[in-house]
Regions:
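Short, charged alpha-helical interaction segments and adjacent helix-coil junctions
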Residues: 447-450, 466
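Short, cationic-aromatic polyanion-contact patches
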Residues: 459-469
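Short beta-strand "wing" residues that participate in macromolecule-binding interfaces
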Residues: 456
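Short amphipathic alpha-helical interface segments
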Residues: 408-425, 432-434
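Conserved N-box helix within the HATPase_c
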Residues: 298
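Active-site alpha-helix of zinc metalloproteases
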Residues: 301
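Conserved N-terminal catalytic/coupling substructures associated with nucleotide/phosphate chemistry
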Residues: 1-294, 304-405, 426-429, 435-443, ...
Length: 469
């Protein structure tokens, strides 16, 4: 966060989900600790001590060193807080408008340490941040944090009262055919259904005692009515908003009996729509195409990523929306690793690793932690905005939004990006870098010149100038 802006002794910044002011002039106030818990359990934030309530006037603290010592003493008292997540650099004494304030940066706690609670009570001392306030966590909030804190895979538990015969056989057969076509010599291909499902993480047990579906197996291969008996909030939804009105023009949703409603069948239903909405009528084979475009791969990656990372006990379900110009996917559950680490690639922490394994066996999850990085790299190559991630606290969800420019605009974007970076770039350079034919590049460049998006200065030995529009 930038330094505070002071106007006539008043701090112009307002309290927010990640910013809080406390009076604390003479001593550390009791309401410091609910905010500490709330920031740690939500998105993190900064607390300034020495700011008058209501007026936001910087009044300072009388003895900042004493306040800092008290904070550290109580942070290391397990009767007061369940965990100290601060480093020495997180607490500092600063001067604002001539008076001393104490600045406390509270990072978001790692998932293994949440919930962070106070006064020795997880039930009564766990808080979350919502808007400008600190609120008690509900039992559902606490349960969700405890699920995330566990090192056990959320989708590995066996589903009581079910047998693998309760799974949708057609879905299992379709999955096995697809895997066999992609991995014809895989050693699991010859196994019977029970042992095959155990090996891929969809079942637990053995041949003599029988096999029980895991949660991953139920989600991948079960009927949606059976899934909802164990996960009442389960719902997968895909909507297109391609008309001139405000409502959706096409919808694929679970729970209506038109297809089995499990994750695998949902992906097989949605894939042709993603292709059609990309105005790409070539042959479709489930989620795969002969000429799968990079933008289609990005959209598929974001959808698969949401399905793998969803907290299916949370609220809201997985929802994909396609509007003119953008595509978004929302899943229940917060981020389990920092966004910066996720965008950098190379590390993944899925809630449902067994679902990830099954999708990797049919080519939908390729490399650990590389999917989001691939999408970001493709956006940079096209010269469009990076995927935007939004996380909400109540309900806890993650939404990612991706720009989807029309095909002509999409082809123009990498050309403009290259010209903006190097005005001396040639048509042949662009053709080689983008994979587009020289004649196609020429047509797009001519159109952009006519529309005023680019300009050529200096003839054949000149340079390109991109006009920001």
């Amino acid at each position: 966060m930038a330094e505070l802006e002071i106007i006539d002794g008043i701090i112009s910044d307002r309290e927010s989900p990640t910013l809080e002011f406390k009076n604390c002039r003479g001593k550390l106030s009791k309401d410091f600790w609910p905010t500490y818990s709330a920031f740690a359990n939500t998105f993190g934030g900064i607390i300034y001590l020495g700011v008058e309530d209501g007026t936001q006037k910087a009044i300072g603290v009388d003895d900042p060193e004493k306040i800092v010592k008290e904070v550290w003493d109580l942070l290391n008292d397990r009767k007061k807080v369940s965990a100290n997540i601060l480093s020495p650099e997180d607490i500092s004494i600063i001067e604002v408008d001539g008076v001393p304030l104490v600045r406390v940066h509270v990072p978001r706690a790692e998932r293994s340490r949440r919930p962070v609670y106070i006064n020795g009570s997880m039930d009564d001392g766990s808080y979350k941040r919502n808007g400008e306030g600190d609120y008690h966590c509900s039992q559902a909030d606490i349960a969700a944090m405890l699920r995330d804190a566990s090192e056990d895979a959320q989708d590995s538990v066996g589903v009581d009262g079910m047998m693998i015969e309760d799974l949708d056989r057609q879905t299992v057969e379709s999955f096995r055919r697809r895997m066999a076509s992609m991995r014809p010599h895989h050693p699991w291909a010859s196994k019977d259904d029970g042992e095959f499902l155990r090996l891929v993480g969809a079942a637990t047990g053995n041949e003599s005692d029988g096999y029980t579906p895991t949660l991953a197996g139920l989600l991948m291969f079960g009927m949606d009515c059976s899934i909802m008996q164990h996960l009442p909030n389960y719902h997968l939804d895909y909507l297109e908003y391609m008309g001139s009105g405000g409502g959706w023009t096409r919808r694929i949703t679970t729970g209506e009996g038109e297809f089995p409603g499990n994750i695998y069948s949902f992906l097989m239903e949605v894939a042709p729509r993603i292709s059609a909405a990309n105005d790409n009528p070539k042959e479709i084979d489930g989620m795969f195409r002969v000429d799968d475009t990079q933008m289609m791969k990005c959209q598929r990656e974001l959808l698969v990523n949401a399905l793998v990372h969803a907290d299916y006990r949370g609220h809201g379900g997985v929802r994909a929306e396609w509007h003119r110009g953008w595509f978004s996917v929302r899943n229940p559950g917060g981020l389990r690793i920092p966004l910066e680490m996720m965008m950098g690639g190379g590390f993944s922490d899925p809630r449902n690793p067994h679902i990830a394994v099954m999708l990797s066996l049919i080519g939908l999850v390729e490399r650990t932690g590389s999917g989001v990085c691939f999408v970001a790299d493709e956006c940079r190559r096209r010269g469009i905005g990076l995927p935007e991630y939004t996380e909400t606290a109540d309900p806890r969800t993650v939404t990612v939004r991706l720009e989807t420019p029309p095909a002509a605009s999409s082809d123009a974007s990498p050309i403009k990006a290259m010209m903006a970076e190097d005005g001396s770039v040639t048509i042949d350079d662009i053709s080689n870098a983008t994979g587009m034919g020289r004649s196609k590049v020429m047509r797009i460049v001519t159109r952009m010149k006519e529309s005023g998006e680019i300009e050529r200065i200096g003839g054949t030995r000149g340079r390109w100038v991109v006009r920001r529009r």
